[in-house]
A protein has these predicted regions:
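Short, surface-exposed coil-to-beta transition loops
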Residues: 3-5, 66-72, 95-100
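Glycine-rich portal/gate segments that line the openings of hydrophobic small-molecule binding cavities
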Residues: 29, 39-92, 125, 144-175
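Hydrophobic ligand-binding cavity/cleft-lining segments
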Residues: 1-48, 172-176
Length: 176
């Protein structure tokens, strides 16, 4: 079994960071890289418990999947603005993963984001031969994740500013 944990801090309160992960409006930007995307198969309840998603992500090409991995994930233990858990079945290498994401408020309207994941290939031979290499490959893109979250925060700030300007009486412009 492999375990990966990492954290970083973002210049935004947990409520805004939460939106980057959970906002599902039709205007939500989609990644330009077709190897990375998430399809919501079932939205879960009002706060997201029971959400089921199908994820696509880059994997080493030597796995024989043309460089694209897939996972089917079920989210539980959702605590809005705080944390959630996921259980996943993924391929190639047919595996199970359990992960948690935690948002912790820190000083100056900032948030510490912590990801923890445990990953295990089902097949004991594949586990010995490939599990560690595959997990290391998937876990080394922390900078990419941080850049995506910062981009998501910028997009949500622009979206909120635009919505505020669209509501009469909320603009800073002089009224006539």
């Amino acid at each position: 079994m492999q375990r990966h944990e990492f954290s970083f801090e973002l210049d935004a309160p947990p409520e805004l960071v939460w939106e980057v992960f959970w906002y599902r409006g039709p205007d939500r930007p989609q990644p330009k890289d077709v190897k990375t995307r998430i399809e919501i198969l079932h939205p879960g309840d009002a706060i997201g418990n029971g959400l089921v998603r199908h994820c696509y992500f880059p994997v080493p090409k030597w796995l024989g999947s043309k460089g694209v991995g897939q996972s089917w994930e079920w989210l539980t233990e959702v605590k809005p603005y705080e944390s959630w858990r996921y259980d996943a079945v993924g391929k190639p290498l047919w595996s199970h993963a359990t992960g948690r994401t935690r948002l912790e408020p820190i000083a100056n309207e900032r948030t510490r984001v912590t990801f923890i994941e445990e990953y295990e290939a089902f097949n004991p031979i594949m586990r010995v031969l490939f599990e560690k290499r595959v997990h290391e490959s998937l876990s080394r893109d922390n900078d990419t994740i941080l850049a995506a979250l910062n981009g998501g925060l910028a997009w949500h700030r622009r979206r909120k500013d635009k919505a505020t300007r669209a509501v009469p009486g909320t603009s800073d412009a002089p009224s006539s």
